[in-house]
């Protein structure tokens, strides 16, 4: 049984992880970090706005915050090593560089999406992108109206898998919007388009289009619980790993 600390306990994902930990046989909640008031808290769980106290009362920290919060956590952990599961998206190149540096001192699992279904979707996308080399690739992602980053980290990861499968640099071929007289689509272009509205938890579709036929592969999340359970599984797995930067594929053995 490992002790879990949550960084970003007042957020939607933090609250979902708290709820899912109630039924876990492998992990228990021991500490919550938040700068905002919380409602009811399980008995015996420490609530704090001090990273020192958070780290002192758990074996693994799970982070679902915003870019600034996640980077601050990772920087702190560089001198106070603790296994970290980072689920915050939109970290950018500076965040990626920091993750690689910090992973020399502790095990870190970083994933833009913690669901098993999305992990398989990425593998299928790689296979299709390589096999269907003449097909055009378009990605559409849909999320609730409150999501702050676009395109989603999951969609960008999906695009990265497709680009890698074709030996392309994603930065050279990605298109995140079209407007006006843009001309014909280029051969290597990978479009990633974002839809925002309502309470959509998450829906990602990658399409492969050719003359006479097309294939679309879709993943729809109907509850944040799928991400929460994935993060808990990742935390349990990470607790016994050596220093290094890991992905959800390492955890799932994919």
From Swiss-Prot:
Pathway: Amino-acid biosynthesis; L-lysine biosynthesis via DAP pathway; (S)-tetrahydrodipicolinate from L-aspartate: step 4/4
Catalytic activity: (S)-2,3,4,5-tetrahydrodipicolinate + NAD(+) + H2O = (2S,4S)-4-hydroxy-2,3,4,5-tetrahydrodipicolinate + NADH + H(+); (S)-2,3,4,5-tetrahydrodipicolinate + NADP(+) + H2O = (2S,4S)-4-hydroxy-2,3,4,5-tetrahydrodipicolinate + NADPH + H(+)
Protein localization: Cytoplasm
Binding site for NAD(+): 8-13, 87-89, 111-114
Location (main, coarse): cytoplasm
Active site per database record: 143 (proton donor/acceptor), 147 (proton donor)
A cellular component term, taken from the record's GO annotations: cytosol
GO MF annotation terms: 4-hydroxy-tetrahydrodipicolinate reductase; NAD binding; NADP binding; oxidoreductase activity, acting on CH or CH2 groups, NAD or NADP as acceptor
E.C. designation(s): 1.17.1.8
GO biological process terms on file: diaminopimelate biosynthetic process; lysine biosynthetic process via diaminopimelate
Keyword hit for NADP: yes
Keyword Electron transport: no
Amino-acid positions noted as binding (S)-2,3,4,5-tetrahydrodipicolinate in the UniProt annotation, renumbered to this chain: 144, 153-154
Keywords: Amino-acid biosynthesis, Cytoplasm, Diaminopimelate biosynthesis, Lysine biosynthesis, NAD, NADP, Oxidoreductase
Enzyme's top EC category: oxidoreductase
Function: Catalyzes the conversion of 4-hydroxy-tetrahydrodipicolinate (HTPA) to tetrahydrodipicolinate.
Family named by the database record: Belongs to the DapB family.
The protein's name: 4-hydroxy-tetrahydrodipicolinate reductase
Organism: Campylobacter curvus (strain 525.92)
Encoding gene per record: dapB
